Amino acid sequence: MFGCQCPRKKKGTMTMMRLRTASLRSLNLDMRCTIRLLDDTEISFNIQRDTKGQFLLDYICNHYNLLEKDYFGIRFVDPEKQRHWLDPSKPVAKQMKSHPPYTMCFRVKFYPHEPLKIKEELTRYLLYLQIKRDIFHGRLLCCFADAAFLGACIVQAEIGDYDPDEHPDNYICDFKIFPKQSQKLERKIVEIHKNELRGQSPSVSEFNLLLKAHSLETYGVDPHPCKDSTGTTTFLGYTAAGFVVFQGNKRIHLIKWPDICKMKFDGKTFHVVVMQKEKKNILTYHTSTPAACKHLWKCGVENQAFYKYAKSSQVKTVTSSNIFFKGSRFRYCGKVAKEVVEASSKIQRDPPEVHRSLIPHSRSSYSLNKQLIINMEPLQPLIPSPNEEEEEEEEENQIDEGILLLQQSEASSAPVLGNSPARGLETTADVTHDEEESIREEPLTISEQVYNPSASLLPTPVDEGIDMLFNSPLRAEREKDDTDSFEDLEADEHAFLIAEEEEMKEARKALSWSYNFIMGNMQLNAFLKSFSKLLLAAIGLLMVVLPLLLILLESDIDVSFLREIRLTPEFEQFHHEYYCPFRKWVACKLSAALNLFGST
């Protein structure tokens, strides 16, 4: 028997050692990570489980030989299609909610407020690639004239001067610059490319695009879809100026960073506490999921810290909760905008070589937002900045200085504007007045139907539209438009329309009742939450006060401040009139209970 037990014990010990060895090896296993760059190329490498996000960011910046790296970040999408920015201070494996191999994207995280203060051409080129993506995915809204100029700058940067021997009449059709390009827009791009941009090098054309893009209202805006308190779809975003709110193509709010006291969230509800002219206001918005709300809050905290403060040492840890309850805590750990600009001015090295890679022009945009039309009226802000005219004058002076610097640094590629004779456009000669009238300029809106914040030809970003998040009625309209077989039916069309109207009325009643019911429940839940928080705070206070009273009443500790409290008339009255009778009553009850227990 004794001999049989020994092998069994040894076998069990060996099994445990194998399990421990396997677990230790799993910590050192390499995980495959792929990062997609701004030109859609990819870099793949192996990381370990404890590798932090800063390693990935440094790896990409070393690949580019990039010094002005604080504008950039790495973004990924979790299995629930929620986007996140990779936290450089935390391990990558703990942030990813999926299994390796991991796929992430290198993107501009903080858009420079003044492109003129970017020191190196390499940084400007990467920002140019990001803005080109924003234009293609419909995130950068602009009027028709600005759209034509931006498109012409992209064409000039990628193919150079117009050459009639190399470029046929319809050469712009090969460029998919916008989600949807009208013929009128393409003709205007051709006109500007032929006559106004001749002689500009790629760096000058890219710089001109940055100057135009940064003057637009949606420059740097990554719209977050939300519902306001009335149920209207809005898009929230952050810029160097502050917090912006869009409805359609109209900016309805611009709240500057110094006016924002606090940003917090609770579940799917996002709050912005604003102090303007000594008046406190709270703006409330509702997201589709709690994860989207937390992402919106973290982006707001990071952008406010980056653009508002003068030094990174001034940035404090922010919490999303109230005083007595633990919530999400977050602190931005990078440099702020002023420190980045100051560090850029101190760069002393030979400019690194810029390797420009052209994205194929023939890629189709029909898999993205089919309804997006770039021809639009200019955006008119409902709340303009009070110092808007002064800012525009300063920007114009800076633009002139920047162009002079570029011309001096690149004498061989200085832009020659309007020196060549203008060639007639063959395509415009055949267009009649009726055709011009038929090409309508429809407004571009950041709407449920057209905006997809992570639309891409690659499989990683989100493919679903915003209407999936909020069950938009636009989907029902699309499904209704797909049924075209009613002409074959012998039913009375008029009766069918009447029945359809009745059904729509009933649906509206049901929707209004559901909305009122949900809003009532939300208000009730908010009241219950506040009451429960107050009750818990009172219980916590009692848990602190009662032990202190017992120490004062029962202990013989002779400390000066305790002796002074005991000698007060109020304490003596409480001791003789309340505490002593209560103690005697408790002692009697306990003795009776003990006697009863002893008798049984």
Curated annotation (Swiss-Prot):
SUPFAM superfamilies per UniProt: PH domain-like, Second domain of FERM, Ubiquitin-like
Stretches that traverse the bilayer: 534-554
Q: Which Gene3D superfamilies match?
A: 1.20.80.10, Phosphatidylinositol 3-kinase Catalytic Subunit, Chain A, domain 1, Pleckstrin-homology domain (PH domain)/Phosphotyrosine-binding domain (PTB)
Q: Where in the cell is it found?
A: Membrane
Superkingdom, natural source: Eukaryota
Which intervals of the chain are annotated as region Disordered? 413-440
PROSITE patterns per UniProt? FERM_1, FERM_3
Question: What topology in the membrane does the UniProt record assign?
Answer: Single-pass membrane protein
Q: Cross-referenced SMART domains, in alphabetical order?
A: B41, FA, FERM_C
Q: Does the keyword Transmembrane apply?
A: yes
FERM domain location is 31-311
Q: Which GO terms describe its cellular component?
A: cytoskeleton; membrane
Any single Pfam family the record assigns to this protein: FERM_M
GO molecular function terms noted in the UniProt entry: cytoskeletal protein binding
Q: Which InterPro entries match?
A: Band_41_domain, Ez/rad/moesin-like, FA, FERM/acyl-CoA-bd_prot_sf, FERM_2, FERM_central, FERM_CS, FERM_domain
Q: Which UniProt keywords apply?
A: Membrane, Transmembrane, Transmembrane helix
Q: What protein name does the entry list?
A: FERM domain-containing protein 3
State the organism of origin. Xenopus tropicalis
Taxon lineage: Eukaryota, Metazoa, Chordata, Craniata, Vertebrata
Q: Which gene encodes it?
A: frmd3
